[in-house]
């Protein structure tokens, strides 16, 4: 709840739209259903009525997860078929695009971002191929594409250095792509590189590790306070960090 509130507080302050997202791997341990989270987000959406928002499933790892999110009230889903074969990725993405219908949005992944997503230990990175991307879009009709251009999930310390984005590849991907491109694993990428990527076709930027660390550091620093004071302080700190990122990514002032 605190992170959802922080997203809306930041969006109001920055006058920015916001995509509030979560993965099933984060929801299941907390015993939260898709409908629970969608309902909570819509409650805050009514309170912050001036903020345009979307409810997005991040890294749906199966068709079942994605269909569950749509049934639970999510307006947008990501199907991550990057771990399987290209043919299976195309087949499932195409089915989910039909299931999402005219009112839903489907993000997919071409190549493999890799890294420590969801606490896993798979660090394989396969960069996106422009010709494969062209073929994928023709066959699936996906609305947005997560690209692999040197970015990765999780703490960059695990990878012994900050991500180094391949801007030449990003330009080639943008040239063949008529849909928004998505940058996953933005935590640890230098600010100048994120800003540059946004000018080159990146329209959605995913942050998790950086925001998680800011929030948890504040909780640890203030755990001697009452729970209410501690959580309130951490929520305000998180909102401030999100607001900074909205400005950096160029969405501030666009609501």
Tell where the protein language model's regions lie, with residue ranges:
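Catalytic cores of large soluble enzymes that bind and process phosphate-bearing ligands
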Residues: 29, 33, 88, 125, ...
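Short, highly charged low-complexity linear segments
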Residues: 211-212, 241
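Active-site-adjacent substrate-binding region
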Residues: 180
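Glycine-rich beta-strand-to-loop/alpha-helix junction loops that act as flexible
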Residues: 183-187
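Alpha/beta enzyme core
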Residues: 1-26, 34-50, 59-177, 191-207, ...
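Extended, intrinsically disordered, low-complexity segments
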Residues: 219-255
């Amino acid at each position: 709840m605190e992170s959802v509130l922080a997203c809306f507080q930041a969006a109001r302050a920055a006058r920015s739209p916001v995509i509030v997202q979560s993965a099933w791997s984060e929801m299941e341990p907390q015993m939260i259903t898709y409908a629970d989270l969608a309902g909570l987000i819509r409650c805050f959406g009514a309170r912050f009525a001036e903020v345009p928002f979307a409810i997005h499933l991040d890294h749906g790892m199966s068709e079942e997860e994605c269909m569950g999110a749509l049934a639970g009230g999510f307006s947008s889903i990501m199907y991550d078929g990057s771990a399987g074969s290209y043919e299976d990725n195309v087949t499932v993405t195409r089915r989910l695009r039909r299931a999402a219908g005219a009112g839903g949005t489907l993000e997919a992944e071409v190549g493999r971002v890799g890294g420590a997503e969801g606490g896993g230990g798979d660090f394989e990175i396969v960069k996106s191929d422009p010709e494969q991307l062209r073929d994928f879009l023709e066959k699936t009709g996906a609305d947005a594409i997560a690209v692999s251009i040197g970015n990765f999930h999780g703490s960059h310390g695990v990878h012994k250095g900050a991500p180094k984005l391949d801007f030449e590849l990003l330009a080639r991907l943008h040239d063949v792509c008529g849909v928004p491109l998505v940058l996953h694993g933005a935590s640890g990428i230098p600010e100048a590189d994120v800003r540059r990527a946004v000018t080159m076709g990146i329209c959605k930027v995913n942050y998790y590790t950086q925001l998680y660390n800011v929030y948890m550091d504040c909780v640890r620093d203030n755990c001697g306070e009452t729970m209410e004071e501690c959580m309130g302080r951490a929520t305000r700190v998180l909102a401030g960090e999100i607001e900074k990122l909205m400005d950096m990514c160029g969405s501030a002032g666009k609501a």
